[in-house]
Amino acid sequence: MARIAGINIPPQKHAEIGLTAIYGIGRTTAQKICDSCGIARDKKIKDLTDGDLEKIREEVGRMTIEGDLRRETTINIKRLMDLGCYRGFRHRRGLPMRGQRTRTNARTRKGPRKSAAALKK
């Protein structure tokens, strides 16, 4: 089993798909990594040589991924909340911040509905 950036990559998957198991790497980035390393996108992870895996590790090592990316995202959201700007306020209240309607919908951000009886107490 290949291990890249502390993540076990599923060996039966294609290189392009397997790389998306790493937080911060999607399909497009995975394609760019495969192309820059000279690896066929449809080659299975288990068929990659140690040299290929080392090239991928080197390429992935230059990117902000996993814990660092999560930390950076959290810091950015905290900065918005500390600034007191509109987006920070919406984050703090748990509401959508990109202009979506909230009278109906927005259930993902707002969570499950609260019954009228629960609000009266």
From Swiss-Prot:
It comes from Methylibium petroleiphilum (strain ATCC BAA-1232 / LMG 22953 / PM1). Part of the 30S ribosomal subunit. Forms a loose heterodimer with protein S19. Forms two bridges to the 50S subunit in the 70S ribosome. It comes from the Bacteria. The keyword tRNA-binding applies. Keywords: Ribonucleoprotein, Ribosomal protein, RNA-binding, rRNA-binding, tRNA-binding. Residues 93-121 are annotated as: Disordered. It holds the Pfam family Ribosomal_S13. Belongs to the universal ribosomal protein uS13 family. GO terms for cellular component: cytosol; small ribosomal subunit. This is Small ribosomal subunit protein uS13. One of its GO terms (biological process) is translation. Signal peptide: none annotated. Located at the top of the head of the 30S subunit, it contacts several helices of the 16S rRNA. In the 70S ribosome it contacts the 23S rRNA (bridge B1a) and protein L5 of the 50S subunit (bridge B1b), connecting the 2 subunits; these bridges are implicated in subunit movement. Contacts the tRNAs in the A and P-sites. GO terms for molecular function: rRNA binding; structural constituent of ribosome; tRNA binding.
